[in-house]
Amino acid sequence: MTIKVGINGFGRIGRIVFRAAQKRSDIEIVAINDLLDADYMAYMLKYDSTHGRFDGTVEVKDGHLIVNGKKIRVTAERDPANLKWDEVGVDVVAEATGIFLTDETARKHITAGAKKVVLTGPSKDNTPMFVKGANFDKYAGQDIVSNASCTTNCLAPLAKVINDNFGIIEGLMTTVHATTATQKTVDGPSHKDWRGGRGASQNIIPSSTGAAKAVGKVLPELNGKLTGMAFRVPTPNVSVVDLTVRLEKPATYEQIKAAVKAAAEGEMKGVLGYTEDDVVSTDFNGEVCTSVFDAKAGIALNDNFVKLVSWYDNETGYSNKVLDLIAHISK
């Protein structure tokens, strides 16, 4: 059965979700809603400064997109309740505007005829978050779910492997995070986050992130044990998590590497990766795993106190897991 998907919001994540869906036979994008006109939408889909040209054909006909010969309905509605998803048979909406992140607001998609909704960002209420490699097995039929954040998708699988094998007493996370659309090209007004208003290409910017605390929501056994922060850096894509933890059960760094490698080759294949190469951030542009453990970058002070490093393409990896969650809730 092909799952019919509508995308609301055709920004960075909306477009990368669309691109990733073209490589899957189980998911078909049938509709896109954004306030862009169709010609500009086609242009934004065709050309991408980070991920290159779209691999396929993109045309506009009668105000709609024709991608690889298939028509995709284009609308420009501000209110999701008016989207008439049922007219094109939408099963699941990928809510990618970054605006409708509560059950109450996202439920407008259900009103408009969709069966289920996946939020492509952490929910702002108690809407459950699901992360592949962490808690997909806890899904219990909810019609509105969140795929959490790109950083939580990197941290949670790694934290789960470490906690399951050695136990985590407590930990601090830092994500060295690529620039995103919320930042400023030059210094500009940012009333809630003064540092965040400084020029993205000129600065390393300390920032807050709820990603580590959110791990406690997807892995309740780690609730209250992790917190973290971010540094925004002047790179266009690919971020890296630095997780420093105290272990319950003493372990050498070699034992930790072996446990992560076993998980990456076993139950977490496609989610958690493992490398012993001398890699840098651009080596992960286009990476579909949401967390690639860098065995050479981590260090241990002793057998109870370690720093672990894991890479993620904060656009591609996350967007692929949005599709995995869509498939999972459609079973």
Curated annotation (Swiss-Prot):
Its EC number is 1.2.1.12. It catalyses: D-glyceraldehyde 3-phosphate + phosphate + NAD(+) = (2R)-3-phospho-glyceroyl phosphate + NADH + H(+). D-glyceraldehyde 3-phosphate binds at residues 149-151, 180, 209-210, 232. NAD(+) binds at residues 12-13, 34, 78, 120, 314. Pfam families: Gp_dh_C (PF02800), Gp_dh_N (PF00044). The active site is at residue 150. Keywords: Cytoplasm, Glycolysis, NAD, Nucleotide-binding, Oxidoreductase. GO terms for biological process: glucose metabolic process; glycolytic process. Pathway: Carbohydrate degradation; glycolysis; pyruvate from D-glyceraldehyde 3-phosphate: step 1/5. GO terms for cellular component: cytoplasm. It comes from the Bacteria. CDD domains: GAPDH_I_C (cd18126), GAPDH_I_N (cd05214). It is found in: Cytoplasm. It is an enzyme of class 1 (oxidoreductase). The record marks 177 as: Activates thiol group during catalysis. Catalyzes the oxidative phosphorylation of glyceraldehyde 3-phosphate (G3P) to 1,3-bisphosphoglycerate (BPG) using the cofactor NAD. The first reaction step involves the formation of a hemiacetal intermediate between G3P and a cysteine residue, and this hemiacetal intermediate is then oxidized to a thioester, with concomitant reduction of NAD to NADH. The reduced NADH is then exchanged with the second NAD, and the thioester is attacked by a nucleophilic inorganic phosphate to produce BPG. Homotetramer. This is Glyceraldehyde-3-phosphate dehydrogenase.
